[in-house]
């Protein structure tokens, strides 16, 4: 039988892998043909560097999360996993912030810079980007919980002995 | 006499406070009158939510960094400082990523979305935003070094005892 703590941690890691994978798939499949000033164009995530960064970062975190699932419990490498969790949480924060900032311009535009909002023309594309960002946020929250849990279980026995 | 380690940590914290303060001042004072399609306008950081977030985040981290400077060494609260360092490093990463993503659109535009680059019209403004981002990056690197240093000095005695 698995310990409840280990089971909870495994469940959280499964959710995290699912969420980052969903973020990659939803963002990568987002495209829609729109018309802008009578010019037809196709909105794709590759048009926006911030969205490309989001896909790459989430793909990296998915691969990492998947590999950690098969990591045996009680291995001395868990200290490394704690450090890597931290690094990949920072990568997620960075990619979500960047994608969110550009998505905000896409939704509301920036009148001072003369950037018009595009979500009116490509509603489906915008909804998909929003979905990907929500999936990314779920992954981020899961990783932060995992991080707090790891720090607690890792530090607690050390603190008791100290 | 201060210990060399403590002196180094204090020096790093001074650099971090200076860098975040510089980021706030440079970004907050950035404004330039430009002409866009014969319409005169003034580019300011308040036009862009991501830049406002950058200024607020850096201001918060400046205040925190300043307060920590006066924190007595050997206090039991240093464990809290380590946790807060982590939180504020994440805040810095997030704000810099968001500002960088929008600054990239400002510099290169996004032809698919019909967003024209604005740096040709407001070069001085763009240079100041770039300066603020560089200051923010310096602060971020300093905080990451501080974090690694804190984790090392905090965990080392515990690991030896364990």
Curated annotation (Swiss-Prot), chains A, B:
Gene Ontology CC annotation, any one: plasma membrane
Superkingdom, natural source: Eukaryota
Keywords attached to this entry: Cell membrane, Membrane, Transmembrane, Transmembrane helix
Stretches assigned to the Cytoplasmic side: 1-6, 71-79, 152-162
Subunit and partners: Homodimer and heterodimers.
Family of this protein: Belongs to the Casparian strip membrane proteins (CASP) family.
Protein name (record): CASP-like protein 1C2
Organism: Populus trichocarpa (Western balsam poplar)
